[in-house]
Every structure is written in C-alpha cells, then in structure tokens.
C-alpha cells in the first residue's frame, strides 16, 4: 500500500469525532459530522504525522472555545486569556472561518453581538458573561463582509440579514457622528485598544482605552490625538461596500452606502497613504504622519483596498521582503528593520512578533489579487512550526515559529484548520465554488513533512476525498476516483461541480495532466499563480499575474 492509499484508508476508517473527543450528539459535533469533515496524514515510516495530531487537537480545542454567553446559546469565544467574543476578531474573521465547520455558532455569534448593541447605535467591542463592553471600538475585519459571506453560505436567511444590516447601519451612523471629529471623512483612533494594537510603538504615549471609558471621547491632553487611522478607515470602506450589497439584496437603495464608501476611500488615500513608501500611516491631529511601519499595511489590503499594481508594490517592497515583514514564521506585526521592532513573543504584543490574527486575516488580501503562491510560501514556516507545537498560541517567534503567549486561542486554532483546507483540502466558497487544493505538506522541514495526507468534506450533498503525496493528488467523489493532478495545483469547481479552473499554488512551475474520469487528459504547464480556465475539458486560456519571490 503506497502512502496515498494508506492516508485514504485511514481517512475512511477513522472517526473524526472519536479522535477529538467531541460527542456526536453535541450541536457542534452534529455539524462537523454532517459536513463529512476529516483529515489524516502519515509519515514515510507509516506513523501518524504531527499535522494530523495537531488538526485533531485544533477541533477539540475549538470546541472548548464554543460556550454560551447569557441567553445567546453557543457562541465562539476568543480563547486563552481573552474572555467572550470580540468584534475585531472572534465575531468577524474567526466566525467567518468557523462558518465552514459550525455555521450555527457563527450565526449565533453575530446575532449576540447585534443584541448587545447600545441604544445610541454603538456595537460592543466584546460581549462576555458580564455583558457588552463599550470602552473602545476595536475594529479590524469588516463585520458586514463576514455577515454577507455567512448569508450566502447558509441558505440566504433574510431575517438574519435584516437584523444584522440594521445593527451595522446604526453602528456606522455612530461612527460617523463620533469618530470623524476633524471632518476628514476617515475614522479616528482615540486609544490603543481601538485597533487592538497592544504594545505597538504605533501608540506609544497614547492611552490604552478611550478617555474616561467613553468611546466617544479622547484625552485632549495627549498630543496628536485623534489619529485618522488607516485600518479603521479601510474597515469602514469595506463595511459600507458590503452594506451596499446587503441593501440591494434586501430591496433597499445601495447608492448611499456606495457614496459613503467612496468618501472614506478618498480620505484613506488623502490622509493615510504615503505614495513614496507605499505604507499607510496614522495622521496625527497636527497633520504629521505617525511613521511606524506596522501590519496596518496588511490590514488595509485585507479590506479590499487597492488595485493589483498597489498590491504588487506592497509585495515587492514590504510583504515578501525579509528585511521588512516576511519572517521565518510569517508576517511580523512591526517591520523587522524598524528600530522599534521587538520580537518578544512571550507576551501579548503587536510590537514585532508574528500574531495568529495577522495570519488568519492575510488570505483576503492575497487571494483578491490572485497571489496564492506567495501566501502559501509565506505561511509554510508557521505551518511547519505548528505541527510540532503543544498549544495554540497568540504570538509566535519570528525566527523559529515557537509558540508564545497564551493557549487555546481560537484565531490560531482556526488558522491551522483554514490553512490545511486552503493548501491541501476541500474548501467550499460562498459563491458556490469548491477549491480542491493539492499543495500537500510533504516538503516541511524539522521532521514535519508528511508522506501523504488526505482530507474529506461533503459539499452540496457530494462527498469529496482528496489524498496526495509529494507527486500527485487524487480526488474521489462519492467514493469513486474522479480527478487526478500533480502536487502544487488547485482545481476550482464551479457551482455545478465541474472543473472550471486550475491554479498553481506552488512557488515554482508545475507541469502535468489534469485527468478527469471519462475525459481525455489535459496537459498543462503553470507558473506560480497562473490560472488556466477549462471549458468542456479543453483549455480556454491562461492568465498569469506573475509571482514575487522573497526579497532581501
């Protein structure tokens, strides 16, 4: 039995819930089982690979992060030392990824946040057993995008969409009334925690919380406040653009949202963008930029900001540059060549270490511009490190990937689950596409390479199994071999389940045949990021956006 056959056999005979200790009658267990989710990986000598053990640990600890809050039922908690669900992460990017595993919990988390809204329209920055909290706004990932994604994935529940749309519209009105005191059209930061950038030199000398615990006030005795904040402003741009989509879906007029999004976008580039460096900086009240090179750049790009040219420049000058943000374990929170960089990963810090949230948010930026090979290359070091970890931490050592601050941290847990589906698994998309990704983790270092891995998921009533080694990938559909292609490709199925495109995820060219049962093989040679469109089993064209290798 070769390694692929062994991994596939383990996948078929294994029990995901038994391996994770989740009760099949548990609500989360029921959703995982109904989705047919599984993952197995074997080493060259037939042992269970570290990645398989960590995958099962991730599901088990994810369940620990799902608990009731008040009358809201089961909701996602941030985990570790962070109690409750947080707007910047748990209820947004965390809940978005969770929606592929436990969609009912995603819905409940969103609705719990909306239920905690204050009478004046402000959404809580977190909800805990003690109730909603309002001492800062703490926004990063746009909630409206996550709501829209969940709506499309789960049967288009218009009551859910209307509830969330009304809550988000009221929150937007609160922000417009209280967080644009300078009339720029942007969104202002009044304190460190508004952006969740704890310990970042971006906010040296700035209070952690808003003045006297009031999110509508800043301390007038602090020079420079308020800052026009690029990440907060970018959040609102994307938020309003998605509120326009939601308005159109609900029969409302989307144009006011589009106009307000355009005004915020103009403010972002007028006040926060430095065209010479390509970075985005806070603009202090005296007009000076706060020149701290931080992951604000990636936060902005992950909010659907910028065209392909701007993103390529960001890759070349910053994100894929080893003197800037590309470390051995992923993207740092402060540029490595900034003299204020501090890589201490043993504390809650955005002053340098790699943060799980940065890595979890990154795919939105890269995939919007077709730069999937750079994304896979950038996170390979953390995947390798995490295969040997004993806990799911918030912060990681940029040099080694060692786990640092806290444990049972849901963003790290969800990052591993997301990355293995994104690289070497079956990932259903909100628009109906299914990604079958074959970048099998067979080339990891530190003894963590697998001989083969196998993943399973049921999508639209069809059960897919994807198994591969260092050479090839086999995809079974409802138990029968259906597709075969070389390691390093992603085959994209359209909403009808037919192969529509092939994308190269690998950092080098990959040539081979796309073999579909009952059809003639299609020979392809693809450079990194190249996308071949397939129609009726024939090549319809290839688009090649280019590739940016690591720079120094």
Annotate each PLM feature.
Residues 88-100:
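Non-membrane alpha-helical segments in proteins
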Residues 85, 136-139, 143-154, 279-318, ...:
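C-terminal capping/lid segments that line or modulate ligand- or cofactor-binding pockets
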Residues 1-85, 108, 206-209, 267, ...:
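Low-complexity, Ser/Thr/Pro/Gly-enriched N-terminal "stalk/linker" regions
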Residues 101-194, 271-273, 327-340, 378-409:
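Helix-terminus loop motifs that line ligand-binding clefts
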């Amino acid at each position: 039995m070769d390694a692929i056959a062994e991994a596939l056999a383990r996948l078929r005979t294994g029990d995901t819930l038994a391996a994770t200790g989740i009760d099949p009658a548990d609500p989360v267990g029921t959703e995982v089982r109904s989705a047919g989710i599984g993952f197995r990986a074997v080493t060259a000598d037939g042992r269970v690979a570290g990645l398989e053990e960590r995958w099962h640990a991730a599901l088990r600890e994810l369940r620990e992060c799902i608990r009731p809050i008040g009358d809201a039922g089961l909701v996602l908690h941030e985990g570790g030392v962070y109690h409750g669900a947080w707007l910047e992460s748990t209820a947004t990017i965390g809940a978005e990824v969770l929606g592929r595993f436990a969609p009912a919990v995603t819905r409940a988390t969103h609705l719990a946040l909306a239920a905690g809204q204050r009478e004046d329209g402000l959404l809580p920055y977190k909800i805990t057993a003690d109730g909603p909290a309002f001492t800062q706004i703490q926004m990063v990932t746009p909630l409206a995008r996550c709501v829209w994604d969940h709506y499309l994935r789960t049967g288009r529940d218009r009551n859910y969409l209307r509830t969330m749309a009304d809550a988000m519209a009221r929150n937007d009105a609160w922000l417009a009334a209280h967080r644009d005191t300078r009339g720029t059209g942007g969104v202002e930061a009044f304190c460190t925690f508004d952006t969740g950038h704890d310990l970042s030199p971006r906010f040296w000398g700035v209070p952690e919380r808003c003045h006297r615990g009031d999110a509508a006030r800043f301390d007038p005795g602090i020079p420079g406040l308020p800052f026009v904040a690029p990440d907060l402003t970018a959040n609102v741009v994307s938020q309003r653009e998605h509120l326009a989509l939601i308005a159109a879906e609900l029969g409302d007029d989307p144009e006011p949202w589009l106009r307000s999004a355009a005004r915020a976008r103009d403010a972002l580039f007028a006040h926060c963008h430095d065209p010479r460096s390509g970075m985005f900086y806070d603009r202090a009240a005296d007009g000076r930029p706060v020149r701290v090179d931080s992951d604000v750049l990636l936060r902005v790009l992950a909010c659907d900001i910028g065209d392909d040219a701007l993103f390529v420049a960001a890759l070349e000058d910053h994100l894929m540059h080893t003197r800037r943000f590309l470390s051995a374990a992923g993207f740092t929170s402060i540029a490595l060549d900034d003299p204020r960089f501090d890589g201490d990963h043993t504390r809650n810090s955005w002053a340098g270490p790699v943060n799980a949230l940065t890595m979890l948010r990154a795919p939105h930026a890269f995939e919007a511009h077709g730069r999937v090979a750079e994304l896979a290359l950038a996170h390979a070091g953390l995947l390798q490190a995490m295969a040997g970890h004993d806990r799911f931490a918030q912060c990681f050592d940029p040099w080694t990937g060692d786990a640092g601050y806290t444990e049972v941290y849901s963003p790290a847990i969800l990052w591993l689950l997301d990355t293995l589906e994104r690289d070497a698994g079956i990932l259903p998309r909100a628009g109906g596409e299914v990604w079958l990704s074959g970048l099998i983790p067979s080339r990891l270092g530190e003894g963590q390479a697998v001989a083969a891995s196998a993943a399973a998921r049921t999508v639209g009533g069809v059960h897919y199994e994807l198994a591969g080694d260092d050479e090839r990938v086999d995809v079974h559909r409802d138990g029968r071999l259906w597709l075969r292609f070389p390691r390093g490709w992603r085959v994209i199925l359209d909403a009808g389940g037919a192969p529509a495109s092939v994308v190269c995820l690998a950092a080098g060219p990959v040539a081979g045949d796309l073999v579909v049962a009952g059809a003639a093989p299609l020979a392809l040679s693809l450079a990194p990021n190249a996308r071949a469109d397939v129609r009726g089993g024939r090549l319809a064209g290839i688009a090649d956006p280019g590739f940016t290798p690591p720079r120094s």
